[in-house]
Amino acid sequence: VGGTLFLYFNLIYLEDTEMDQTKTFYITTPIYYPSASLHIGHAYSTVATDAIARYHRQRGVETFFLTGSDEHGQKIERKAKEAGVTPQEYVDKIVAGFKDLWKLLDISYDGFIRTTDEQHIKAVQKMFKKLYDQGDIYKSKYTGHYCTPCESFWLDRQIEEAGGVCPDCGGPVELVEEESYFFRLSKYADRLIQHIKDNPTFIQPNSRTNEMLQNFLLPGLEDLCVSRTSFTWGIPVDFDGNHVVYVWLDALSNYITALGWGSDDDSLYNKFWPADVHIVGKEIVRFHTIIWPIMLM
């Protein structure tokens, strides 16, 4: 976890004190989902990240600014089928539009990761196998509610509390039963709670810290589904060909695979990791401040 700070992107914090120019600075945007063209919210978080990156560069700090695209999943597979193209062709076209927009806005990113990059795919497979071998991933069966647009699974009580719809987007959910691999989030919940309490600036603003603790961590975490068998557009689990890696391990790990973690050249990883700031939108705070830190533990 290190010293990473998660900033909900309507708040920007800049230090006025003189910076140590011998240090490095690593800042990221979320990686964006190419199911459609980007909108003002994507631009907002990216411009905010760009401003912070430029601030550090201007003060002589060696800076790495990462952005990218999260390209796998059932929604992409369905969209590509509707468009009459392959999933790869579908994302290639939309990601080209991402880069055109960042060029138009003069975004000064240092790295652009695509989760279809071969380096990323191999690193994710390595991570999945490592977690499986150490007993943190196990195979079971999932029965419950699934929202395709949000790529989120929900318990019965969560759907009931939301009035029968997805608690995040308000859209319809479907009941699914599927063999899956699960990650033992519950094993690390107490450790993450203590880390958040020991590091009060870990998540900002503070209202988001309270939300994560009161709504998710303190009531207790369920183990996390990390593979799917109902679609094929994803990174294959290399020791079980019926499964593809689900979004959590695939997308969230981009912050280290983009720096070369799991590859033959991890020089950028050794130089810049851990990240100093992850800029995220409010709808993905839970994934970045609970799932991602636990993955790193």
Each language-model region and where it sits:
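A glycine-rich helix N-cap at a beta->alpha junction
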Residues: F98-S108
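Aromatic/His-enriched, Gly/Pro-containing loop or helix-boundary segments
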Residues: Y90-K93, S108-K122
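Cys/His-rich short segments
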Residues: D136-A189
